[in-house]
Regions:
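N-terminal leader segment of winged-helix/HTH proteins
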Residues: 1-46, 93
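Charged, amphipathic alpha-helical coiled-coil/dimerization segments
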Residues: 2-8, 87-149
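Hydrophobic alpha-helical core bundles mediating ligand binding, dimerization, or RNAP-core interactions
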Residues: 21-43, 118-136, 141-155, 159
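N-terminal helix-turn-helix DNA-binding core of bacterial DNA-binding proteins
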Residues: 33-80
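Amphipathic alpha-helical interaction surfaces
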Residues: 34, 58, 65, 87, ...
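Short acidic DE-rich linear segments
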Residues: 161-163
């Protein structure tokens, strides 16, 4: 049995049976591989490298972004963002505009072509997620979504402990 410190439980040490730990590791690995394969398919389908595709998707949440903001959201250095942004500009998916409040700052925004591409990507993702949910009975969906929320919260809590 593995003893795992748990700062959220009443008992400071939680017993995690080895079989559960192994099953969890195996499932996480398989989910990660499945997501990686979908990302590769998506990159091929939309003819964008992974980093450019992930960057483009950030514009779904924001009308304007800065290179610094992209670097923070993508967890990469600003010089890497410059290369990604240059690729998206070359493909006419985003454009640079001067910040009206600070001419030293360049804002990045989607072009009409970029907006259309992002809509295609989002429609593709919506369809993929719909197809996944269709594989799960309506009764099980609620439990799956609840458990995914719990998993996400647990993973974020552990991530915070690592920082």
């Amino acid at each position: 049995m593995n003893k795992v410190a748990n700062s959220y439980a009443m008992d400071p040490v939680v017993d995690v049976p080895e079989y559960q730990l192994q099953q969890f590791q195996s499932l996480i690995l398989k989910l990660f591989q499945c997501c990686q394969e979908r990302m590769q398919y998506q990159c091929d389908r939309f003819q964008l490298p992974d980093a450019e595709l992930r960057c483009l998707m950030l514009f779904g949440e924001e009308r304007y972004l800065t290179a610094k903001g992209i670097a923070l959201k993508m967890n990469v250095v600003k010089s890497r963002v410059s290369k990604i942004v240059d690729g998206l500009i070359k493909k006419k998916l985003i454009q640079r505009i001067k910040d009206p409040e600070d001419s030293r700052v360049s804002l990045l925004s989607l072009t009409p072509v970029g907006s259309e591409k992002l809509n295609e990507i989002n429609e593709f993702l919506k369809d993929v997620h719909y197809q996944v949910l269709c594989q799960i009975t309506p009764e099980q969906r609620k439990a799956v979504l609840t458990n995914l929320d719990i998993l996400k919260a647990s993973m974020e809590a552990v991530k915070e402990m690592m920082v």
